[in-house]
Regions:
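Primarily membrane-embedded glycan-assembly and transfer machineries that use lipid-linked glycans
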Residues: 1-139, 175-282, 293, 297-299, ...
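Long, contiguous secondary-structure blocks with strong helical propensity
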Residues: 94, 145-147
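Membrane-interface alpha helices of multi-pass inner-membrane proteins
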Residues: 135-139, 147-172, 265-271
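Long, intrinsically disordered low-complexity regulatory regions of metazoan
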Residues: 325-326
Length: 327
């Protein structure tokens, strides 16, 4: 029992997941917005009419996310699955980055307290919080030269929401740049394998949807609100976001912080160049900010050793002083 109480499970996972569960219990009656629509589409995907799931151009979710929603179905249960799942993924990613128990506990509780886990359910778009965390994990694997696994994970993130493909720049963190192409190929195959069945067996109209530029966005300052914004412009938006991420990846590849700065760059450019603006878009930046803060705080003792050892050093100096002269 004593060993268990000293373990990271008892010191980190239990309190964070308990806090997330407590928040989820309060959210059971919350209206989760688009999540209701996604659940219905998920139920269709798991039915005999699965081939027509993406016949509605409005549906921009990935098939893996729909499978999860359709399988669980119950919104109260989804509150627990999504909120605890988001908290657990954050702790897992921080653990892979070598963050200690104390900082992981603080980051996990901050995620619950700041609303990251709660809004992952209540806003109805949990992928906004989950996808960037998967990118960070893929970046860690890419730095370890595990490009196949990294490409696979990025492809899986696109199965939640298609913009997950934008995580490709983290593949440039591999020690051998030529292998980044292998990871990108794996990512492409995974994405294609998820979407092809719907295109071959039914009507795949996801790419027929057009957005309209809204006021309050950067694009709204350049073009008139209401201007159509279709998939060709989405590809331009994606290219700019991924290009910026690639620049950060190649110029900062030696820094540990690159594993979250590349995803953050992509996320921020994606949001700033988007034709519409929703509050849940910023969940991605919040998740990455928690990862970055934990890494920065972990480095502080090594960067400022005097601050860490100041009191002890002062004690040693006083102890080393010569004794007073007695008359």
């Amino acid at each position: 029992m004593r060993d268990f109480l000293r373990s990271s499970v008892a010191r980190v996972w239990v309190p964070v997941l308990a806090a997330a569960a407590g928040m989820a219990s309060l959210d059971r009656g919350t209206d989760p917005g688009d999540l209701v629509y996604f659940v219905h589409r998920g139920e269709q995907l798991l039915s005999g009419g699965w081939a027509s799931t993406f016949a509605d151009p409005m549906l921009q979710s990935g098939p893996l996310q729909l499978v999860l929603f359709g399988a669980v179905r119950n919104l109260s249960a989804l509150a627990f699955v999504l909120e605890l799942g988001t908290a657990a993924l954050l702790l897992l990613v921080l653990g892979r980055l070598g963050v200690g128990d104390g900082l992981r506990l603080a980051a996990g509780l901050a995620a619950v307290g700041a609303g990251l886990t709660q809004l992952a359910f209540a806003d109805g778009h949990p992928a906004e919080a989950v996808v960037p965390l998967l990118w960070v994990l893929a970046a860690v694997w890419a730095r370890d030269d595990r490009v196949v696994a990294a490409g696979l994970l990025i492809g899986v993130s696109a199965g939640l929401e298609l913009w997950g493909v934008l995580g490709a720049p983290v593949l440039l963190l591999t020690p051998r740049l030529r292998r980044a192409a292998l990871g990108a190929a794996v990512e492409g195959v995974v994405v294609l394998a998820q979407l092809a069945p719907f295109a071959l067996a039914g009507r795949m109209r996801m790419f027929e949807h057009e957005w309209r530029v809204t006021s309050g966005t950067l694009l709204g300052l350049v073009v008139a609100p209401g201007t159509h914004f279709g998939w060709p412009l989405r590809l331009l938006q994606a290219s700019l976001a991924m290009g910026a991420g690639a620049v950060v990846a190649t110029t900062m590849r030696r820094s540990l912080h690159v594993v979250w700065l590349v995803p953050l760059t992509v996320v921020v450019l994606r949001v700033l160049l988007d034709p519409v603006s929703f509050g849940w878009y910023w969940l991605a930046a919040e998740a990455l900010a928690l990862v970055g803060a934990a890494l920065v705080l972990r480095e502080l003792p090594s960067r400022f050793p005097a601050a860490r050892l100041g009191p002890a050093a002062g004690t040693r100096r006083r102890a080393a002083a010569p004794p007073p002269v007695r008359s």
